[in-house]
Amino acid sequence: MKVSRQQYADLYGPTVGDRVRLGDTELLIEVERDLTTYGEEVKFGGGKVIRDGLGQSSAATRDDANVPDLVITNALILDYWGVIKADVGVKNGRISAIGKAGNPGTQDGVTPGLTIAASTEIVAGEGLVLTAGGVDTHIHFIAPQQCWTALESGVTTMIGGGTGPTAGTSATTCTPGQWHIHRMLESLAGLPLNFGLLGKGNASTQPPLAEQIRAGALGLKLHEDWGTTPAAIHAALSVAEDYDVQVAIHTDTLNESGFVEDAIRAFAGRTIHTFHTEGAGGGHAPDIIRVAGLPNVLPSSTNPTMPFTVNTIHEHLDMLMVCHHLSPRIPEDVHFAESRIRPETIAAEDVLHDLGVFSMMSSDSQAMGRVGEVITRTWQAAHKMKVQRGPLAPDGRADNFRARRYVAKYTINPAIAHGISHEVGSVEVGKLADLVLWSPAFFGAKPSLILKGGLVVAAQMGDANASIPTPQPVYPRPMFAAYGGCPDATCLHFVSQAGLEGGHLPDVGRRYSAVKHTRDIGKKDMQLNAETPDIQVNPETYEVRVNGELVTCEPVDELPLAQKYFLF
C-alpha cells in the first residue's frame, strides 16, 4: 500500500525529505532521519493503533524496564545534534528512549525502552516540533511572576540571582550571602522550574566568596555596580577553580578600574561566562565585544538588543536609566548611558551570533531584558540573518544547520556553561524530560505543551467551562504538574558540590543536584557556537572587524513571530 507524502504527513507527521516552516519565519527544517517504522507507526485515538493487543502490550507491566510512563509519538525533534522523527519515551521523569515505540508482541523493530503498556500515557506528537526546555542563565529574581512567564514561553530552567524588587536585585543578578541564598532556595521550591542561584562575586578576597558557594550558590556573579575590579575578578575565579563552579561577569563600563585588556589579564586564561557581551547591557566601553573571540570566554547575549531593529537604540536609553538608578537630569548619568548604547556593536552582534561566535542567549529579566522572549528573539534573529545573509553553509534547501546552531544557544550551551548539562539542555536519553512541543505555525512564539520532568506543567488551554478543551479564549495556563507536591518531584535546585556535601542546605522538599565540569571547559565546548576569531573595535567609530573584515547589518522595521501572534 502506498500513500502520498501529504496524506502520510497528515496521519503521522512529516518524514525524511519533508520540510517544515518554523512559524512565519523564512526558516525551514528538513527531516534527516525517521526512527519510526513505515507501516508500524503508533498513533492514539478511535480506530487507531495504540489499543490493547495491537500497539499496546496486553501483558507488560510498569516493573518492566522497557515500559515507559509516557510516550510522545511521531515527534519531529529539533536539537543541536540533529532534526529527526521519532517516538520519545519517558520513565521516572527522565528521557528513557528515543526510537520506535509499540508492542513487541505484534510489531517488529520496537526500540528497547519503548514498549507501550497499560501504564503508559500518550502525548500525540504528530505534526509537532519537539525541543528541549530552555535554559535562561541571566535572571534577576525581581518578581516571582517572571517564572510563570518564562515557563509559558518554553523555558524550564532559570539561573541568576536576587531577592525581590530591591535596589541590588533590580540592577545585579546576585543573591548575596548564606541567609538570602537559603531563603530564596526555600521560596523557589514552590515554583515548577529548575533553579540555580548566583552569589555575589564582588570581593577582592576569597573568604566572603567561598562561604557563598558552601551555602549552595551554584556560581558567582561579578557586576560593575558592586565594583568589578581586576582584584575581584581574580578572587572570584580563584574560588571558582577551587569549588568547580562558574563565574558570570558584567565588566566595568566606565573603565574606572581598568580597560578590557586588564579584565582579560585578570581572567588569566580561566573560563568565564560574559553576560551581554556586546556591551549595551554593560561592560567595558566600547570594546568588551572583543572577548567573544577568546578560547576561555563563554559569551552570551541578553535579548533586548537581539535582533537589531529600528527601535532598539531608542528604547535602550530609558531602559538603562531605570535599571541602574540613573537620572536624566544628571549629565554624567546621561553620558554613562550613552556610552553603552552603540549601533555599530549592536549591528555586529546579530552577525556574530550567525557566525557561531556568540554562544548563548538569555533574558536579563526585568533588568534590561524580557523574560518571556528568549526563545522568540533567538528565532527572530535566525530569520533576520537568513534574510540578510542568505543560507548558512552547509545548508541548502533547508536551514537545519542554522536551526541547530540557534536552538543550542538557549538549551545545551547555557547548560554546559553552568555545569548542568548532565541533567538538562537537550533531548537525550538520561536527562530530565523537560520538553516543549510546538505547532509549527506557532514555533518560537507560543508552545502547545510544556513538560517538566515528564508531566504537563503548562499548555495552551481553552475555556475550562467548555465541553471540549479548545474553545476560546485559548492562552497558556498552568496544568496539574504545577501544583501541590508535583514540582518537588519533577524539578531540581542546582547547587555547588560543596553545598551539597556540607549538609547545611535547607530542606525544601525537592532534590538538589550539584553542578560539575565548569572549569575544564572552554569555547570549544559550546556546541555549534565555538568560533574564536580575532575581534577588534575602532575606538572612534565603534566599527567591529572580525579577522580584519567589517561586520555589520541593517536594522529591520518588521519581524516574524510578532504582531501576528501577540496583542501586547
UniProtKB/Swiss-Prot annotation:
Carboxylation allows a single lysine to coordinate two nickel ions. Ni(2+) 1 binds at H138, H140, K221, D364. It holds the Pfam family Amidohydro_1. Keywords: Cytoplasm, Hydrolase, Metal-binding, Nickel. It is found in: Cytoplasm. GO terms for cellular component: cytoplasm. Transmembrane segments: none annotated. This is Urease subunit alpha.
